[in-house]
Amino acid sequence: MSYQEQQCKQVCQPPLVCPPRSAQSPVLCQSAPSLVLLQSAQSPIHCQSALSHAHLSHASRNALLCNLLHHASKSAHPRANKGFSSLQNQKKRTESILHKSIATPPSSI
């Protein structure tokens, strides 16, 4: 288990949401994992990446990393987490199928 995964198990919290103070004033929030420009009624709301600020506490940074890792693991292919031996077994099966298809001539129509 990687260091980031260990930290995620300790501190995994949803990202903070920065509500606008008013419809006419821009709001700067540091909770989104990427630079986002949202349009409100009359002025933009700027959300900067929390990962780019050095003054964040370890807990905040770990929580953001945890959320990113959690999202990545959800979107990953279900078989992507299998071990190396599974890849070797799959190679052997593929080679076996290819060998059988070469050894057996196709039936004539």
Swiss-Prot record:
The gene is Sprr2j. The keyword Mitochondrion does not apply. Not expressed in uterus. Disulfide bonds: none annotated. Belongs to the cornifin (SPRR) family. This is Putative small proline-rich protein 2J. The lineage of its organism: Eukaryota, Metazoa, Chordata, Craniata, Vertebrata. It comes from Mus musculus. One of its GO terms (cellular component) is cytoplasm. Keywords: Cytoplasm, Keratinization, Repeat. GO terms for biological process: keratinization. Cross-linked envelope protein of keratinocytes. It is a keratinocyte protein that first appears in the cell cytosol, but ultimately becomes cross-linked to membrane proteins by transglutaminase. All that results in the formation of an insoluble envelope beneath the plasma membrane. It is found in: Cytoplasm. Its main location: cytoplasm. Residues 76-109 are annotated as: Disordered. Sequence repeats lie at residues 21-29, 30-38, 39-47, 48-56, 57-65. Residues 21-65 are annotated as: 5 X 9 AA approximate tandem repeats.
